[in-house]
């Protein structure tokens, strides 16, 4: 149990670190851009892009910054917001997409995330055009009570620019 929870939290931390790698480039955050490279396709939306909503434990989250969607090698990487407060998800490129991992960042002192195969939490995804709905239960550790895992329901609705 402790090992699986540690793996889940480590996965969330890795995802959070990955967001910082995706957040470079458009520092002003005021213009939308689209680019492609040899490893896949990257799509960016301007801050406050329509269609983005994140809910954790029934509460809307204030997530600001760009939406970056990258499709490479059969995997969709979605990053919302900046490195410090961002949300990230990794999905398969199938229909329906399978959730590989989700990083929700720090919510009220608890770093929340989901990683498939750990036995901790759950997540499903659906796709409608360029819009994704990712929902489930993320897990984390409250450092005030590290022996008691924290589970929070979440839902992410995001649209990737075509």
Curated annotation (Swiss-Prot):
<feature type="compositionally biased region" description="Low complexity">
    <location>
        <begin position="28"/>
        <end position="42"/>
    </location>
</feature>
<dbReference type="GO" id="GO:0005886">
    <property type="term" value="C:plasma membrane"/>
</dbReference>
<keyword id="KW-0843">Virulence</keyword>
<protein>
    <recommendedName>
        <fullName>Lipoprotein LpqH</fullName>
    </recommendedName>
</protein>
<comment type="similarity">
    <text>Belongs to the mycobacterial 19 kDa antigen family.</text>
</comment>
<keyword id="KW-1003">Cell membrane</keyword>
<dbReference type="Pfam" id="PF05481">
    <property type="entry name" value="Myco_19_kDa"/>
</dbReference>
<keyword id="KW-0472">Membrane</keyword>
<keyword id="KW-0732">Signal</keyword>
<feature type="region of interest" description="Disordered">
    <location>
        <begin position="24"/>
        <end position="53"/>
    </location>
</feature>
<dbReference type="InterPro" id="IPR008691">
    <property type="entry name" value="LpqH"/>
</dbReference>
<keyword id="KW-0449">Lipoprotein</keyword>
<feature type="lipid moiety-binding region" description="N-palmitoyl cysteine">
    <location>
        <position position="22"/>
    </location>
</feature>
<comment type="function">
    <text>Might be involved in ligand transport. A host TLR2 agonist, modifies host gene expression in response to pathogen.</text>
</comment>
<feature type="lipid moiety-binding region" description="S-diacylglycerol cysteine">
    <location>
        <position position="22"/>
    </location>
</feature>
<feature type="signal peptide">
    <location>
        <begin position="1"/>
        <end position="21"/>
    </location>
</feature>
<keyword id="KW-0564">Palmitate</keyword>
<keyword id="KW-0813">Transport</keyword>
